[in-house]
Amino acid sequence: MLGPDQFRDVSDFQVPQVVLRLEKVIPSDPTLLNDAVAEITAELDCAACWDDVEIIGLVVREALANAIVHGNHCDPEKTVSISVAVNEDCDLLMSVKDSGAGFDPSALPNPIAAENLLAPHGRGIFLIRQLMDEVDFKFDHGTEVRMRRRQNWLE
């Protein structure tokens, strides 16, 4: 194990090449959500890496909806950006960024707790965390949700 002032030489690491990259910026208008999700999932479907592109579409929908509704409060003057990359190993890397003030992910209520089961909101981040291998948040001039799903995530 390396100490706090030691660094591993990463020059010999093999980094898979990106074979598909999508970047899209949309106004924070919920009526544009379906078209944006359809466009992104169609491109990913063409990459032919997954049999379950619908699940990835659900993640895209939830991440974009959270950014539009909760991050930017449906203000069409504010934008949401999404960046999607697929590498040669068919790993999916995705980032969704809004202009919102941010939030504390650890403070989100448990959506499967009895008192929250019928709540109209509160399942998006939970679903994203369940369906992706890695999810983290960055708060710098907005909120960025960064997600990764490995091709072999079910193995």
Regions found by a protein language model. Give the residues of each.
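Conserved short strand/loop->alpha-helix "switch" segment adjacent to the catalytic nucleotide/phosphoryl-transfer site
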Residues: A38-A65, L117-A119
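Conserved beta-strand-loop-beta-strand hairpin that lines the nucleotide-binding pocket
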Residues: M1-K24, I68-E155
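Alpha-helical macromolecular-interaction surfaces
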Residues: D35, I55-L58, D91, Q130
